[in-house]
Amino acid sequence: MTENPLGYEKISKLLKNFAVPSIVASLIGSIYNIVDQIFIGQGVGYLGNAATNVAYPFSTICLAIALLVGIGSASHVSLCLGCKEPKAAAKAAGNGIVLMGIFGIIYLLVGETFLSLLLKAFGATTDVFPYAKQYASITLIGMPFLIVTNGMSNLIRADGKPKYSMVCMVVGAIINTILDPIFIFVCDWGIAGAAWATVIGQIFSFILAFRYLWRFQTIHFEKESFLFDIKESLKICSMGISSSSNQIAVTVIQIIQYNSLTYYGALTKYGTDIPLAACGIVMKTNAIILAIVVGISQGMQPIIGFNYGARQYHRVREAYMLAIKWNLVVSTIAFIAFQFFPQSIISLFGDGDELYFEFAVLFMRTYLFMVLVNGVQLLSSSFFTAIGKALKGALLALTRQTFFLIPLTLLLPLRFGIMGVLLAGPVADFSAFVLSIVLVGTELRKQKNATNISPQ
């Protein structure tokens, strides 16, 4: 069997080859929502923006499912390949693909059945609800395709073809971007046009990703590879739970934030709809930075997973530290943009009155103040997932959202009103950063001193 370059190639070259396409693919995923937001803001107004924000939890839940199965199966595959177990790798990939399809269909049915109830729970106001329902009812159709595409992208990267994974996402995003102005302005379909443009783009990405099923090189499928195995499926989910749980926590915090902003916003001069619209714009802007960090972590994972399985711990440490340095460069640029050019960024998403821009600028500067350290927690969680320590990875993934941000979002507004919702972000970011440094530092010291560590 040919030696895998993950075990001997220069780490900087590997991270570049794997992370850059992953970053592009991850950015493309976030662009689906960003592009819709910009065109809807220009064509419908800030109520349209608020509507897409209310519907956004559907996308984060979808991503959570894709990460659960995609990251889980890809991490399992990388470990199996590192241990030179090709049949086990094929079984992991096959069961992962089957799970993607099952979860996608279930998600569509549940979402459409309880759509109105869910939108109200997500914080839709009376004025926003009609737009949100129209948008979400259409975009849910594309969710099964999105789950399979995002999930298979992780397997394609694990197969050593990150550029193809990137192409799958880029094609869909280009189609979405072309169709958005046509459907919204030329066809005059409004917010429904943006939704259909998104779905069509997702279908094209799905077709390209699914075609790769017959092109895998390090994974050799047999019919038995796709036989549903409950034990194998649970293993996959356990290895993807850290990345997925972070997204689930993101969904929960979105719902809490939207409801808190409308409640406390009603007590201020901003009202209910302005905070809701501003929050979504800030979160989706930050999603671009997080997408880059996710791309770095996805590029880092197969490198760390393979070398941990091969017991080359010095390469594990080198890959993690290089990923942290990349993150620092990105977050520094983001900090400068968010603190010094917030109004220019917000203006991209459409016009609004003076109160709208006043609150949106305040939100961006305050909530994203600790963006410099935000990515460390995500990279650290992915680090533990890659070395097979799923429980520790899951716990670390939950720290910012569940252990810090959710309680702070509920408690701080009691003292500081709507400003408390904004302050919860930087406090949670810094707290999660400190915990991440402690846990990863301890693990790296263990690896440095160990001669025979096996995945737990």
PLM-predicted stretches and their roles:
Residues 17-36, 138, 149, 172, ...:
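Transmembrane helical elements of multi-pass membrane transporters/channels
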Residues 12-31, 35, 58-65, 141, ...:
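Residue-level signal for short hydrophobic patches within transmembrane helices
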Residues 20, 36, 73, 114-115, ...:
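Hydrophobic/aromatic residues in alpha-helical transmembrane segments
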Residues 70, 139-157, 165-173, 194-207, ...:
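Short runs within selected transmembrane alpha-helices of multi-pass transporters and secretion channels
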Residues 49-109, 146-165, 258, 278-342, ...:
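Small-residue-rich hydrophobic transmembrane alpha-helices
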Residues 1-21, 77-142, 186-241, 304-370, ...:
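Short alpha-helical transmembrane segments in multi-pass integral membrane proteins
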Residues 31-50, 119-126, 182-189, 251-282, ...:
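Helix-terminus/linker motif at the lipid-water interface of multi-pass membrane proteins
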Residues 61-64, 176-180, 206-210, 288, ...:
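Hydrophobic transmembrane alpha-helices of multi-pass small-molecule transporters
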